[in-house]
Amino acid sequence: GHTAKNRLLVFSQKPAPIQVTWLGYPNTTGLSAIDYRFTDFIADPIGKADELHSEKLLRLPNSFLCYKGNETIVANVNLQKKDKQHITFGSFNNLLKVTPEVIKTWSKILHAVPESHLLLKDFRLEDNARHYKTLFRSEGITEDRIECHGRLPNMTDHLKLYNKIDIGLDPFPYNGTTTTCEALWMGVPVISLLGNNHAGRVGASILNSIGLNNFIAEDINNYIELAIKMANNENLLVKIRQNLRKRMQTSSLCDGANFAKDIEKAYQDMWYKHTNNYQLNKLDNKSYPEIKSINCFSTAYKDTKMDGPR
C-alpha cells in the first residue's frame, strides 16, 4: 500500500498474473493492477467499502489478521492499582492517531475515574512529552497523571511496559492493530470504538475474533461508559486479565494453521477464477456475521524473536 518504501510502481506493471494487497495499509491502492485485497467481514462489511476499492475485497472467514505472541514474556495479571493505588489506562499507539477528539474523550474518562493515570508510549514522546501533557492539561488533567515513554531498547522491554497498564484505550477513528494485539497478549483488555471504515474497525475485528465483543463501543459515550465501568469493577477486570492470554491462544486470531488454510483456499479460488473465468465461491458469498454480545459486566461472566528499539 501507500506506505514508506513501497513498491507500487513495480506492481503497477503487473509482474504477476494475480496480485494481492494485504496488511500495513488499511485502504485501496487505487491500482487496477492489484486484483484483490485481503480483509474480513468485521473490518470491511459487505457493501460498505467495496465500490471505493480498485481491488476486489476478499473477506477471509475469520480474521484478516494472525498473531503470534512471545510466550517467554509473562503477563502481569494483577492490577497496577494494587501497588499504585490508582487505575492506569494506556495506549502505545502512534501519537498521530491521538487527535484532539481522542484527547478530549480520554480526559473525560480520567475525570470520571478519580486519581486514574494514562500511560502513553511513542518515539515522538522523547522530545514532545511536555507538549502532549499540555494538551491534556487544557482538558483539566494535571501533568502528574500523564506518564510518557519514548523508544525502549528492545522488544522485551516494550512488551513488559504493558504490565504497567490496567486497561487499554484504542484511538479513533484510526485504531491500533499490532499495539492492540500486543496489549491483549500481555493481559490488557482494550476498549475500541467501532468506526465506519477499515482503519476504524480493526479494533472491533480483533476483539470479535477473541470473543471480547463487549469491549467494542458503538459511540463515544459508550466508549467512555465502558472504560468507567471496567475501571470500577476491579474483580471482573482481574478475571478478564487472568484469562486473556489463554483466550487469545485458543482463538482464531492466534490459529496460524487454520489461517494459513484460509489463505491457501483464497489463493486456489483466485487461480481458479483466473484460469476458468469463474466467480469466487463461498469466501465472498457468506453473509456478514453479527457481532455477538457477551455480557461481561454480569456476575455470570467467567471466561474471560524480534529485537531492536520499540
PLM region spans:
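Catalytic binding pocket for nucleotide-activated donors in carbohydrate/polymer assembly enzymes
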Residues: 143, 171-256
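Conserved catalytic-core segment of nucleotide-activated headgroup transferases in glycan assembly
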Residues: 62-153, 157, 161-163, 280, ...
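Generic, well-ordered alpha-helical scaffold segments in large soluble proteins
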Residues: 105-112, 135-139, 161-164, 168-171, ...
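A donor-sugar binding/catalytic signature common to diverse glycosyltransferases
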Residues: 1-16, 20-31, 154-202
